[in-house]
């Protein structure tokens, strides 16, 4: 037998709702480790850095220099 027979479950990170798509209040937009995307208008950060929407609307991504923001309008 071999000592290498282990594998971890995937963490399922990434963008869940893309730009110009609708989102409901409380809907998860980005799952991330650390603040790769920062919260913009009507967005909040969960304790595991998840970005979620505070209101119903359309998701918009914005890059300001090196900083990436996610907004809901």
Curated annotation (Swiss-Prot):
Pfam families from the UniProt entry: Ribosomal_L27
GO biological process: translation
SUPFAM superfamilies, alphabetized: Ribosomal L27 protein-like
GO annotations of cellular component type: chloroplast; ribonucleoprotein complex; ribosome
PANTHER family, per database record: LARGE RIBOSOMAL SUBUNIT PROTEIN BL27M, RIBOSOMAL PROTEIN L27
Family: Belongs to the bacterial ribosomal protein bL27 family.
Name of protein: Large ribosomal subunit protein bL27c
Protein's organism: Haptolina hirta
């Amino acid at each position: 037998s071999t000592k290498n027979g282990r594998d971890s479950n995937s963490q399922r990170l990434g963008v869940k709702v893309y730009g110009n798509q609708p989102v409901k209040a409380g809907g998860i937009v980005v799952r991330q480790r650390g603040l790769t995307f920062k919260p913009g208008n009507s967005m909040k950060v969960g304790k595991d850095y998840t970005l979620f929407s505070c209101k119903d609307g359309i998701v918009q991504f914005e890059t300001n220099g090196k900083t990436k923001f996610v907004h809901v309008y």
